[in-house]
Amino acid sequence: MNLTLKDFHVPNEWNVKSINDNSFIQECYQKAIEMNIYDKSDEKGKAVMYHALTVCPAFWPTVTYDQLVLSGYLMLWLILFDDDLDTVFIPDDEATEIINRTELIFLEGILPTNPTKKEEFTLFFRNQVLKMSGNRLDMFNLFLNYTIQWIHSIIPLNKTIEPHMDLFLFIRKLNVGVYPLIGLSCIFFSNDKIDQSLFLNPRWLKLCEATSIVTALYNDCVSYAKEVKGNAGVNNCLWFLQKKNNTSIQDTFKYICEKSNMYIKEFQNHEEKLLNQYNNIQPLATLLNSLKYIMNGKYYWSMNTARYASPSSPFIEIQNAVSPDNKLINNEL
């Protein structure tokens, strides 16, 4: 059984060459060592972090080095936070406490009682985002809203019963973690030339939703072997739709592709109409391009990272994503 990710429709014009410089990862890694997030002897932890952060130039191919470092801190924080909670093995009350303590850090800018090393890193990251925001407190608040919304979306899908697809997409568009990326892009690319009414415009909200859902559908396909091995298949639509609908993996994948392609068409439709609503098009177009780069970056990066690589994957591209770190990051079924 060999499926191909080429069945997803990704517009060619969205494909922008990413920055060919991963030196920012070392800076992020050194900060993680300095804050006792990782131990220097932890080769697997280093490999997991490295391959997670290589997505940053794909998501943000046009940013400065300092912005790339901040994006690296975001991805590092996402994997630290999500890996603890995105499992059926942690009790809900314990997960809720972690979420509430993290929300306090983002809202108040202070540490909770007896903070963990990860919580100390969360505060450091939050303050770095505030610093990057400069005088754009509105964009910092938008980032906070998107990020807090995400952390509260993790537990609802951390269950053992397959959800209805509509309910899954409603929660998954938050749960997949794209909204914090969008929030950071708003800090990077928003300026005084963008009409602030944009961020309350229903079309902007629909564009963000489409970006998140398309990325989630890509993610569930490329991470299929990794998540099934990690007993997280119940939250993977490629897995649970087969079980729920008694369909083959081929037919299930076809359905997911059709869903993704539908949302991309919806994105293009809303983009065109949104650009026609505003006078100063170029700054807005730059911001909207950043949403495309998230979808496009996830698609192409996923085929070349050890984070998902597995000979057991049903997808040819993931089977062939060979890396020296494949032995450390074992996704075999």
Swiss-Prot record:
Q: Where is this motif: NDxxSxxxD/E motif?
A: 219-227
EC class name: lyase
The alphabetical list of record keywords is: Lyase, Metal-binding
EC number per UniProt: 4.2.3.-, 4.2.3.47
Asked if Zinc-finger is a keyword of the record, the answer is: no
Coiled-coil parts of chain:
none
Q: Where is this motif: DDxx(x)D/E motif?
A: 82-87
UniProt cross-references to Pfam families, sorted A to Z: Terpene_syn_C_2
GO molecular function terms noted in the UniProt entry: metal ion binding; terpene synthase activity
Q: Which Gene3D superfamilies match?
A: Farnesyl Diphosphate Synthase
From the UniProt record, list the reaction(s) this protein catalyses: (2E,6E)-farnesyl diphosphate = (E)-beta-farnesene + diphosphate; (2E,6E)-farnesyl diphosphate = (1S,2S,4R)-beta-elemene + diphosphate
Domains: entry comment: Contains several highly conserved motifs that are important for catalytic activity including the aspartate-rich 'DDxx(x)D/E' motif and the 'NDxxSxxxD/E' motif, both of which are involved in complexing metal ions to coordinate the binding of the isoprenyl diphosphate substrate in the active site.
> Which PANTHER family does the record associate with it?
BETA-PINACENE SYNTHASE-RELATED, TERPENE SYNTHASE
Function summary: Terpene synthase that converts its substrate farnesyl diphosphate (FPP) into the sesquiterpene (E)-beta-farnesene as major product. Is also able to convert FPP into delta-elemene, beta-elemene, (E)-beta-caryophyllene, 9-epi-(E)-caryophyllene, and a yet unidentified sesquiterpene.
Recorded protein name is: Terpene synthase 2
Species for this entry: Dictyostelium purpureum
